[in-house]
Amino acid sequence: MKLSRFLLATFLTCVFPTHAQQVWIEAESFTNLGGWVLDTQFIEVMGSPYLMAHGMGKQVKNAETEITITEPGTYTVWVRTKNWVAPFDAEGAPGKFQLSVNGQPLEKVLGTEGKDWLWEKAGHAELNGSAKLALVDQTGFDGRVDAVLLTRDASFNPPNELAATNTLRRRLLGLPEKAPETKSYDLVVVGGGYSGMGAAISGARQGLSVAFIQNRPVLGGNGSSEVQVWAMGGTRRGLYPHLGEIVEEFADRSSNSPAADPAEFNDKLKEEAVKGEKSMDLFLNTHVYGVEMAKDAKKIRSVIGLDTKTGKETRFVGQFFVDCTGHGSVGALAGAEFMMEEKGHMGMSNMWVLKKTDQAVTWPTTPWALPLELEDFPAPRAMEPVGVKNKLNMTGFDLGYTPTPNMEEYLHGEWFWESGFDKQPLKDLELVRDHNFRAVYGAFSALKSKGGEKYTNYDMQWLAYIGGPRESRRIVGDMILNGEDMVKGLIHPDGCVPTTWDQDLHYPKEQYAVKFPNNPFISRAEFGKHTDRKNGYPVPYRCFYSKDIGNLFMAGRTISVERQALGSTRVMRTCGMMGEVVGKAAWICVRHHTSPRGVYEQYLDILKDLMNQPGAMRRDTLEGALYLPANAKKLPEVASDGLDPKKMPGIIIDDEDAELTGDWKKGEGLKPYVGSHYSFSSAKGASARFAFAVKESGRYEVRAYWQPHENRGKSVPVSILSTDGEKTVTANQSKPAGKEGYQTLGTFTFKAGEESAVIFRTDGSQGNVHLDAIQVISAK
């Protein structure tokens, strides 16, 4: 059996007579968490889930529990905690709290010591029989608690070293050496993000018995309400246009990322989609921390998980396993070869939301946060009304939520609040998250103290305490896909999942990296070579299983790709389609007694046939025939990335018909666009002339189409040449052109047959000039 050396324990409030002088209480086992949240992200880093007072500057309600003491007496009370800003040599201790016993706070204020997790002596208490414990937050700034230890031995000092702490934990909790096991499942899926959901649902619809394991209380991973990254990537296209149909049954239709209301990410819909599969067992709040290998082969026999709320340990036995953890955790525990950049990788984001209230809101001083000036970070942006962003993923679908009124009252810090580029992508994750906290709190402090009246009435409504990582381990398969194959369009015989996202890697944004060069917290997206956005590049099946472990699949950002390719494949709708393919391949493995590699070598035609079937198709048994249920969810047609100029009224001059001067690049990333692409440039002296002639003299409205981006020009000069003469207006292309994708440049007089034009220039634009299309329509 292989276990993470940092692990762990059953999380029970319990007393054992054989160790009556010492009582261990896991914070996670408190019966009422109050306003404290359960953090499970860093179990491999610090040894346990823990509770955190994430009140964003407002004290949270007490976490409470009751224990029974069998030996009365005077107990020394220890609490395992951390001053979370101390590793940064920051001033103060923001996460202060106390432990209350029977309504009486102990003398020591906790969360103030050390640079790592350690035991702080909270005080002493006279205990006899029943005792009520409470964690009393003092600040709302992320105080954290792993465990409480009571001892009658006044000379006992619990160990701070992690391995010794966990040895003590296991001894005092009386953990069995071997956890009980489940029945044997056909497929065990570990990780409940989009890739895991795709694999679990797809496998269940093929008649497999599926154990679906997720270490959070909700499904969706980065696409859940806890993280609020909207799911990107084109589905239902390419070689196998039915791939993605399962994903679209549960994908979000959010208006913003993050949104004014986290409910836009529709956790309920995701759970309903999973629970609708009768052959699947869902295990939420279960963290996999170990594997048990088969004795006679390099295969996994079971994965070992613990319930992060009740502490129950379980071995999940299966024939085949899917690593959808995002970190390649199962593969690494099993000994699979993997790739990982220790430095120079993409970071982790913790996004945030502000809301304007009807009165002034005070904000505490934060001397421990990053000392920021207004120019040290991008100001949070106003949210857009429903339908301006993410429109393609909304078209034809039930949104699944009621749009938030008064959207203009919300501001948000988006995906680019990202750090950890040169930090170890696994061991340093808690430090990365906490650095993000310091950046966000420091930014809000700057807005409050230096932003004038604009931010007086704003309050912090939401800050993700669960981070959204982008890159860590990638398990090596029989093929490592490189980015150049995508660009060249090299199609492999097992190409299947269409990846449509351009090769998008993140780096520190130089403008904001000057003050904190060792750990920048604002990123920029660098788009490399383009992929075929219309049809997608088909990612090979051989990237979806381990070359070393005979029964291990993977799906999501942990598949077998090099970094440039990862920049394209990592987005969530694409990851979900990988899961769909893996679920089908797992059925072939079970039904035909083969391996993931054997599917490619012997049964590829069967896999191709399955990928050509609608996602709603299912079979009731392993041997049963596929059929389409009468109640199968009907999906709307795929919304086009581009607007068809032939279907638009008036005169349409697309960017490909414009007369371009200077260096212009083509793009497809900002959707929707008119025609097959758009063009953009910031080259000095570049220009674009959209020439046209009307058939009838008269007054015409002139419209310019574009999609916004932060790097687009804020003052783009646009000249309209008409019978009235030349008029120049400026366009802010960093903002949306309008709900319909265009901005009216004005109404002008044009003479029939006379050449007129709209001219864009880069000089003075303050960013990239975006060319999509000009529309000239009668003003009658």
Residue ranges of each PLM-predicted region?
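Sec-dependent signal peptide recognition
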Residues: 2-9
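Sec/Tat signal peptide C-region and signal peptidase I cleavage site
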Residues: 16-20
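Extracytoplasmic
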Residues: 21-176, 641-780
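Flavin (FAD/FMN)-binding glycine-rich loop and adjacent Rossmann-like elements that form
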Residues: 176-181, 297-302, 312-320, 324-643
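Beta1/beta-strand and adjacent pyrophosphate-binding region of the FAD-binding site
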Residues: 181-193
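N-terminal Rossmann-fold NAD(P) dinucleotide-binding loop
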Residues: 196
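Aromatic pocket-lining residues of Rossmann-like dinucleotide-binding sites
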Residues: 203
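Conserved N-terminal/central alpha/beta ligand/cofactor-binding core
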Residues: 208-209, 214-294, 339, 346-349, ...
